[in-house]
Amino acid sequence: MTQPPAPTAMDPAPATALRFAAALLDTSLPPPAGLHAWNGSDPAVRFAVYRNNVVHSLVAVLADTFPVVRQLVGDDFFGAMARLYVLDHPPRSPLMHRYGAGLPAWVADFEPATALPYLSDIARLEWARLCAFHAADAEPVPVQALAALIQAPQRLARACLELHPTLAVVRSAHPVVSLWAAHQLSDADRDARLAEVPLHSAEAALIFRDASDDALVVELPDADAALAAAIATGAPLGAAQTAHPEADLARVLSLLLRHGLVAGVGGPLPATETSA
């Protein structure tokens, strides 16, 4: 069977599409050549309208993903900030639930938001909730199957837990859990709750999807959160506990088991995988 010749140059249709896409989110670029309006109007004007609609729709996606960030800074500030992010970081996937992963880190370096040092961590928490909604499901290990392991301290110390794919740990030097929780209330209750939040306290949380498909935010002590994060990396429980002596291993395990967040149990990882 005769093979078709290898292409020697980019097909003009994809090349035009690439130029069109690039110009949509780069206002310094002119509209791609060859555009025509069906009614004879100026293609550059119509392209500018379309460009604005695309940016506006992406800003709306970010507003839906980060509602508490938007409430904290106000609609106008958020709209301007999100527009800059969209122009700096256009989507790389057609799946809009994946868009905005870089916003928390970007906000941390966004100078106009420096008066709200907790804003980036609030964005991290909200992104973790979105990821929990869309993460793969996994069957939890039955509590009965873990009973023997829990009763054998030496085996327990060597065990590695595979945690549920929806689980994330968020640790912050700011009261991000309290701030996020206050914004889940009505306006009157929210303002009263916010007045009670100590803005210089550190907070941490586990974020995961529960059996009812809700993304929960469960506050826990920072040391316990650090231990949970170590367990999530596959570290043996004994080593994780040694690295975080202030944490309560029993309390962390109880929390993980109660919410069905242990998806597998294994022995210690090979040395080649644990060394760095």
Question: Residue spans of the language-model regions?
Answer:
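Long, charge-rich, low-complexity alpha-helical segments
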Residues: 1-72, 76-152, 213, 218-276
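Short, functional C-terminal segments
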Residues: 127, 133-188
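A general structural signal for short secondary-structure junctions and capping/turn motifs
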Residues: 122, 153, 157-162, 195-198, ...
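Low-complexity, glycine/alanine/valine/leucine- and proline-rich hydrophobic stretches
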Residues: 163-233
